[in-house]
Amino acid sequence: VDNNIQTQYNFPLKPGMKVQVSREKNKHEFRHPMLKILYEDAYLIVVEKKEGLLSVATDHQKERTAQHILNEYVKRTHRNNRIFVVHRLDRETSGIMMYAKDEKTQHTLRDNWHDIVYDRRYVSIVMGDMEKDQGTVRSWLTDRKLYVSSSPVDDGGKLSITHYRTIKRANGYSLMELQLETGRKNQIRVHMQSLG
């Protein structure tokens, strides 16, 4: 539309606008050493984020984030385009992330997240030799701004459940597969620390 690539299905057209239709993919290539686009359509972008990159902006870091990088990418097709955060991954966590291209999609994905993403598994290396081959950690986590506290009884925190399986032990470390029933801030870190 008027020499701008437009993928929005309900983009409002006005008399006098020049419209061209192409079956070719968007010519704006995306290349970034910390992000790889795995899937993209008019509603969402699915990326593989490498460790070391924040997923969203913080008070201290606005630009070196997946959110900022993807915002710059979608603005190449139209200056008003932007992306919307659906979920987060910690800076030192690599994995698959999903960002919405509009607020309606963001709300739909967030409101139905546990129905859409029913299996969340992580592979992690932890210090120490795990005593058990598998088990479940169940505790109540409370975000206390500077740290997240864990309690084995309901102390007003949020119930958090992590299932774990030891894949391998070597040289004082354990390779773990972790399956989350809940997705709380720092859940994996706090639950693994509680196991010793």
Where are these predicted regions, by residue range?
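RNA pseudouridine synthases
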Residues: 1-196
